[in-house]
Amino acid sequence: MDKLKKYTPDGMRDILFKECEEKLYVEKKLRNLYKLNGFSEIISPTLEFYDVFNFENQPIAQEKMYKLFDRNGRILVLKPDMTMPIGRIVATKVNYKDYPLKLCYTSNIFRINENLNGKTSEITQSGIEIIGIENIKADAEVVITAIESLLQLGLKNFKIELGQSKFFKEIIKNENINKEEVFTLKNLIENKNYVALKDYLKEKTKIIKADTIKILEQLPRMFGDIGVVYEAKNLVNDNEQLKALDEILSLYKIIDKVGLSKYVSIDLGMIQDIDYYTGVIFKGYVEGVGDYILSGGRYDKLIGNFGCDLPSTGFGINIDNIIEALRIYEVLNIRKFRNVILHCENKYLNRAYKIANRVRKNNIICEISLRDTIEDTIKYARSKCVDKIIFIDNREFIKIYDINFNKSKEVIIDNFLEELI
């Protein structure tokens, strides 16, 4: 086993220095936005019982979960998602009466990625959940918060695609097709495989009504601006189908009034995980990033799996994909701090620490050199791209060396901060 001690497992990676700073920056920006919107943060354990994720229509295949056993032989998993643990917590730990309950989170999740394809199996997910209320205002707040999250991070070249899980369900509700056939239909429509879908539906003319086939054939093409919804309404007569489409229209109108509709498009063929969702669904894409960066929607039946029926809606952001997008568009505006190093002999360390604390109170990074010689300190400072070195002894003056200009200046100790700020 010693041969593996220098490596990370498949799908795992180390995050170092600049990338770590970028990640913490993004997480902090999102946390602050959630807090200012009235969301309270929640943290769930990394290990959960497998049962938390083992229920009908949950969207994560058990083959994608990292499993292990506790000392009693019970199956545990590294949590593959945050929404279901939040459902467990709300149903069992939160004594809340005045809904809605607005929660947010930032956490690592784990999903086995067998093909890898540059993807990792450990993902940082950040998001919000609005629990205990079922209305269009809650749906709008979730989508608007998703848009504002991306804008807050500096992204502009993105689209939030809105779909409706109810629409497809209502289309096939009265058709005599089994789960396997529904699964095939969903994949063909989601992947916009027009030819294969048409051929498949030709084989099903005896069990699927002609009007239904006509709508299903059009579903992969029903994407674009809000006009797509009006086109869909002209194709259907069923009241429940029309009601599902009206929900998207109502949501879009709110987003439009807020002035954010330019970031929204429609995709009625977005139906891959609709068994999990019960209403409006959405995904966020950034031009140049291959995978979606966020996803969400309404899932009114999920918390019922934990014995507490509460309507819910929310979204999760893939932090790793967000950082990729921010790099592409060069909008990672991380504040840069001035950086100095302080050098002294051991006998002046007491004085050095007092001066260092004065420097740090002015939001300047101040590192006390651990090198013994001036030459080694200068060499170390250059490797760290430090601007200035402060030399301290027992005098009332201190020497400040500017590395970039190769110049030194002695200043009275009471006034030295002016030379750094």
Curated annotation (Swiss-Prot):
Compartment(s) of residence: Cytoplasm
Entry GO MF terms: catalytic activity, acting on a protein; histidine-tRNA ligase activity; transferase activity
Keywords: Amino-acid biosynthesis, Cytoplasm, Histidine biosynthesis
Keyword check for Amino-acid biosynthesis: yes
Gene3D superfamilies the UniProt entry points to: Bira Bifunctional Protein, Domain 2
A Pfam short name: tRNA-synt_His
Annotated GO biological process: histidyl-tRNA aminoacylation; L-histidine biosynthetic process
Entry GO CC: cytoplasm
UniProt keyword Iron present: no
Disulfide bonds: none
Entry-linked SUPFAM superfamilies: Class II aaRS and biotin synthetases
Domain of life: Bacteria
Pathway field: Amino-acid biosynthesis; L-histidine biosynthesis; L-histidine from 5-phospho-alpha-D-ribose 1-diphosphate: step 1/9
Family under the similarity heading: Belongs to the class-II aminoacyl-tRNA synthetase family. HisZ subfamily.
Role: Required for the first step of histidine biosynthesis. May allow the feedback regulation of ATP phosphoribosyltransferase activity by histidine.
HAMAP family reported for this sequence: HisZ (MF_00125)
Note: This function is generally fulfilled by the C-terminal part of HisG, which is missing in some bacteria such as this one.
Record's subunit section: Heteromultimer composed of HisG and HisZ subunits.
Protein name per the record: ATP phosphoribosyltransferase regulatory subunit
Gene this protein is translated from: hisZ
